[in-house]
C-alpha cells in the first residue's frame, strides 16, 4: 500500500463515520500539501547540489534579470519581500563565492549597489540550463493538456483562496 492509498483509507474511514464528510475535498487538500512538500524538497535538493538555497537563487535571478545586473540591497529586498537583514546575509555569502560584488552607488556615496560578477553570470546561466532540464523531467510526466489544465486549476484555486482569506 503506497502513501496515497493509506491517506485515502484514513479519510475514507472519516467518511464512513459521517456520510456528509467532504472526502474528495479532504483528499485533494492532502494531495496538494504532499505534492507541494515533495516539490519543495526536490527543489531544495537540486539547488543544494549547487551549494545554494532557494533564497540565494532568488537573489541571483533577480540580479540576473535586472538592468546592468545591478541593484541596491533595498531594491532586492523590496522585489523579493525579504528583510534587509536577510539580503545582507545572502549578499555576504554570494560575495564570498565571488558571484556578486558590492560597489558604491553613483547617485549616493553612502549607498551600496550589488552587482553580479562574470562568475555569477556564468553560474546562473549554468544553473538555469540545468534547471530547464530538471523542470522538463518533472513536468514531462504530464501531457501538455494535463499541464495546461493543472495551471488553470491552480490559478483558479489560488484566486479563490485569496478571496476566502480576505
UniProtKB/Swiss-Prot annotation:
Top-level taxon in the UniProt lineage: Bacteria
Single GO molecular function: DNA-binding transcription factor activity
Primary location: cytoplasm
Keywords attached to this entry: Cytoplasm, DNA-binding, Transcription, Transcription regulation
Classification via SMART domains: HTH_MARR
Short name of one Pfam family: MarR
Residue ranges of every copy of the HTH marR-type domain listed in the record: 25-159
Any GO CC annotation of this UniProt entry: cytoplasm
Protein's cellular compartments: Cytoplasm
Signal peptide as annotated in the record: none
PANTHER family the UniProt entry points to: TRANSCRIPTIONAL REGULATOR, MARR (PTHR42756), TRANSCRIPTIONAL REPRESSOR OF EMRAB OPERON (PTHR42756:SF1)
UniProt name for this protein: HTH-type transcriptional regulator PrsX
Organism: Escherichia coli O6:H1 (strain CFT073 / ATCC 700928 / UPEC)
Amino acid at each position: 500500500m503506497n502513501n496515497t492509498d493509506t491517506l485515502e483509507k484514513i479519510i475514507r474511514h472519516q467518511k464512513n463515520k459521517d456520510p456528509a464528510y467532504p472526502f474528495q475535498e479532504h483528499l485533494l487538500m492532502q494531495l496538494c500539501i504532499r505534492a507541494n512538500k515533495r516539490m519543495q524538497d526536490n527543489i531544495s535538493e537540486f539547488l543544494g547540489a549547487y551549494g545554494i538555497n532557494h533564497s540565494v537563487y532568488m537573489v541571483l535571478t533577480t540580479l540576473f534579470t535586472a538592468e546592468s545586473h545591478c541593484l541596491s540591497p533595498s531594491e532586492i529586498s523590496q522585489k523579493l519581500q525579504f528583510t534587509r537583514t536577510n539580503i545582507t546575509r545572502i549578499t555576504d555569502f554570494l560575495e564570498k563565492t565571488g558571484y556578486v560584488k558590492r560597489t558604491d552607488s553613483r547617485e549616493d556615496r553612502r549607498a551600496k549597489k550589488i552587482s553580479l560578477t562574470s562568475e555569477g553570470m556564468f553560474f546562473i546561466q549554468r544553473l538555469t540550463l540545468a534547471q530547464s532540464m530538471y523542470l522538463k523531467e518533472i513536468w514531462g510526466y504530464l501531457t501538455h493538456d494535463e499541464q495546461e489544465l493543472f495551471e488553470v486549476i491552480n490559478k483558479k484555486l489560488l484566486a479563490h483562496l485569496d478571496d476566502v482569506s480576505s
